Amino acid sequence: MAKETFSIEFAGRTLTVETGQVAKQANGAVVVRYGDTTVLTAATMGKMATGDFFPLQVNYEEKMYAAGKFPGGFNKREARPSTDATLTARLIDRPIRPMFAEGFRNEVQVINTVLSYDENASGRVAAMFGSSLALAISDIPFDGPIAGVEVAYIDGKYVINPTVAEKESSSLELSVAGNINAINMVESGAKELSEEVMLGALLAGHNAVKELIEFQNEIVAKVGKEKAEVELLHVDEDLKAEVIAAYNSDLQKAVQVEEKLAREAATKAVKEAIISVYSAKYENDENLSIILRDLAEILEGMEHAEVRRLITEDKIRPDGRKIDEIRPLDAEIDFTPRSITHGTGLFTRGQTQALSTLTLAPMNEAQIIDGLNDEYKKRFMHHYNFPQYSVGETGRYGAPGRREIGHGALGERALEQVLPSLEEFPYAIRLVAEVLESNGSSSQASICAGTLALMAGGVPIKAPVAGIAMGLISDGTNYTVLTDIQGLEDHFGDMDFKVAGTREGITALQMDIKISGITPEILAEALAQAKTARFQILDVIEATIAQPREELAPSAPKIDTIMIPVDKIKVVIGKGGEQIDKIIAETGVKIDIDDEGLCSIFSSDQSAIDRAKEIIAELVREAKVGEVYEAKVVRIESFGAFVNLFGKQDAMVHISEMAWARTAKVEDVMKLGDVVKVKIMKIDDKGRVDASMRALVEKPEGYVEPERKPRERRDNKDRRNGNGFDRRNNDRNNHNNHNNNSGNHSFELRERKSHVDHEFPELSTKKPE
């Protein structure tokens, strides 16, 4: 195949697709260039798998060379995918998966490799486009194409594929994907936006998606391959009719058992009895394994059909609830002692239960994220764990999988919208959700438990957040939207639409579907039902704890902050860390200073924090013109006196400024050690301060200012002491993570120009010129 190139302008950037040049042994491969982002996508198909699921694998490979960076770590090589790469792979998988035929069981692998990265041209948008197109032009049976975009909401307007700067000013971060007819994937974080604004964003995003799909269709028409004939998994129709006729009523009764474990036991017993009958019947048949495989599919289909029939026809759910009814709710705080943990929340919804535990720490414990974007510190972490005992099973127990990472990220987006700013609450925050029981919607239970833990721990969140999962049963013509879906409804339903938010608005959305798409009408109905349910859950949360506690747990570290001018960082640190060492030794605190001048002080002793803050405030204090001080005389010269205003800040009082009458000698007015009242008259561009005593005394009536020769300061030798030195230590080594371990200072030294500008040395004996 010869190289083909296709281009359009999309959302302010050029989108270029190249085919036929690279990865030609894959079933389908494309190079997508969006802005300066380049993604290679290759799609391949393997043999038919033996399992009862579609083995689709989507990878998003972040190569550090794409951003001109070296990988971290000892080996200097990319290892396991980052959290962001894992989430992006899930984001692509979810809209693609429903576009394969029922019964398709061949292995399909889609690999997206980021070759160059432009932060203002989304790699995930390019990779989603490339994944769909690689499948669409290949011979792999794929009922696409699909596409996805990002949507921001800025000053009342929707922006498609926003730049980094636009994202920073946006109140919405939305990824939406779909086919030409409908939306089939949503992922969003939002700053308490209304249902109407969110629905508008979804529709704006889908309109943009249609443009990308039309572009793909043009490419497929020119370079697409004929689709391969692939065997789909079909069951024996005669066997299916026989089993339904004989056993459907038994399975219907089992499905209608309301309690989860009892229902599972009942359906399992019915299925095992049927399998036993047919195992004996076809014991000597060489196709026994195929018969039993078909039988398992038939029984699953019978259960699937009965659950959907109950909901759509009888308007009864398997557990007996109404269509819009929430399961029984319970909320509790302080599940573990506050003397040990910093805050806990236990949230139960029916047979789904999550325990969330809060941990607070200084910002030096924040997670450092180093990916294709610039390195940054991640202050808030929400981790989700799903042990197998939560569903009464045994299984793998180890590092979190893609599902756990995804559910944790959803909770993180929902809760981070209401967190206080770093200036308001200078802590790194970690929430860990342990799912203790699960019968559907455990990710939303973790959000509710997280809200309880934050409030119990004294984190001043703006408002409590609750989450609910909405479901859908649709036959293509009629549909039913379900509130608070349980596991069975999730498994056999068509949609899992998670909505989290406060009373003011939505903070997070996530939608996965098993059908080709969802109409705007269904989305609007689901959002409206979710709002009603969310308020009911918030009632329970607020009845448990109405407001965040005013005090942190006794076990939580105490932190206070003070903003210091960037040019004063050197003063607080001192030469070689001498000054900050002195503060630490005196108070016993730990101190962290960032490049912006945010100085965090932490200790278990509040009085120690207060003392350290007082010392630092004094060190960075600056004199201002017009201020009045009680100042101590620290040096006397023939032309005037030097007085100490505070800390290491001195001022010079010229002899002519000591009184309105002529002063012959400084000693006639003051002596060393005297305390005099002075007013700041001038501060020059080098920070030298002139003060006056006479300015605080009323000018005598009839006073005439004598003529004086203008006084000029010399750049190289100041009149005061013959040099340009500052008494204050001006080392500007930036200090981070400084602790009071004996002699062990952990701080980062950045190259700064060394200043030795000591002004007014107290012990100088050099006479002025």
Swiss-Prot record:
Ranges of compositional bias, category Low complexity: 736-746
GO biological process terms, semicolon-separated: mRNA catabolic process; RNA processing
Annotated compartments: Cytoplasm
Disordered: annotated span: 700-769
Cofactor(s) listed: Mg(2+)
Occurrences of domain S1 motif (ranges): 626-694
Record-listed E.C. numbers: 2.7.7.8
The KH domain, residue ranges: 557-616
Record key words, sorted: Cytoplasm, Magnesium, Metal-binding, Nucleotidyltransferase, RNA-binding, Transferase
Pfam families: KH_1 (PF00013), PNPase (PF03726), RNase_PH (PF01138), RNase_PH_C (PF03725), S1 (PF00575)
PANTHER family named among the record's database cross-references: POLYRIBONUCLEOTIDE NUCLEOTIDYLTRANSFERASE, POLYRIBONUCLEOTIDE NUCLEOTIDYLTRANSFERASE 1, MITOCHONDRIAL
Binding-site residues for Mg(2+), renumbered to this chain: D490, D496
Family to which this protein belongs: Belongs to the polyribonucleotide nucleotidyltransferase family.
Protein's gene: pnp
Protein name from the UniProt record: Polyribonucleotide nucleotidyltransferase
GO CC, any one term: cytosol
Catalytic activity: RNA(n+1) + phosphate = RNA(n) + a ribonucleoside 5'-diphosphate
Stated role: Involved in mRNA degradation. Catalyzes the phosphorolysis of single-stranded polyribonucleotides processively in the 3'- to 5'-direction.
GO molecular function: 3'-5'-RNA exonuclease activity; magnesium ion binding; polyribonucleotide nucleotidyltransferase activity; RNA binding
